[in-house]
């Protein structure tokens, strides 16, 4: 089973991306993606 999660930028805290995540994984998703507000690649973490 997969669920929809939202990713937010660690620098500016904007919620820029949504993606699917497997429910069996316990740790939070952490991906380096482009933030259009910061205008650079930053770490994006899964939000609640």
From Swiss-Prot:
GO terms for cellular component: cytoplasm; ribonucleoprotein complex; ribosome. Pfam families: Ribosomal_L33. GO terms for biological process: translation. Disulfide bonds: none annotated. It comes from the Bacteria. InterPro entries: Ribosomal_bL33, Ribosomal_bL33_sf, Ribosomal_zn-bd. One of its GO terms (molecular function) is structural constituent of ribosome. Keywords: Ribonucleoprotein, Ribosomal protein. Belongs to the bacterial ribosomal protein bL33 family. HAMAP family: Ribosomal_bL33. This is Large ribosomal subunit protein bL33A.
């Amino acid at each position: 089973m997969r669920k929809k999660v939202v990713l937010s930028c660690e620098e500016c805290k904007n919620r820029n991306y949504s993606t699917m995540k497997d429910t069996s994984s316990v740790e939070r998703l952490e991906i380096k993606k482009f933030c259009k507000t910061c205008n650079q690649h930053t770490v994006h973490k899964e939000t609640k």
